């Protein structure tokens, strides 16, 4: 395992693959967590680590592995984002949604710049998924209150994500439930999204 909050981690992962002579033609960026405490109560160091894991490490790993993909005539990149990237920024801890929105745009940029070289990037935007994410982030109790029809198994999400990535799709929103939700989020006025975000935020995370 590797701690992606450490600046050198992406380079060490790449060097390990080189040492083992691995030919990486499918890169999956799927590291993340949430911060329970309010923005003003979180240390700058914690915020920097958060940005590094969810954002900077994705950019660095993609940048490190793309040259070999070009050399080998193509490759696939999966960037695990979130439906939070389409929601009001305040719906989940202040940095989470905006970072995921940035990841979507970054994935689009990879497609624009490298699709003609046989490299495609897929931004995967799942909703609530049964993993260790919420327990590790300290919000499992809140997760348990989410309606069952909005919670899906990791296996189902992974299958749709892998299929979309191998097919070279630019965006994957797993399950019809979240496809409909994202459609609504894209078409609702920003004023309505802000109201939704304000309503969702209290009680989901530490607001002290």
Placement of each model-derived feature along the sequence:
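The beta1-alpha1 cofactor-binding region of Rossmann-like NAD(H)/NADP(H)-dependent oxidoreductases
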Residues: 1-12, 44
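Conserved NAD(P)H cofactor-binding loop of Rossmann-fold oxidoreductase domains
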Residues: 30-35
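Substrate-binding pocket helix/loop in short-chain dehydrogenase/reductase
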Residues: 38-40, 46-51
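Active-site helix of classical SDR
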Residues: 62, 99
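Residue(s) in the substrate-gating loop at a strand-loop-helix junction
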Residues: 82
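Active-site-adjacent segment of SDR/Rossmann-fold oxidoreductases
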Residues: 87, 109-120
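C-terminal helical subdomain
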Residues: 123, 144-181
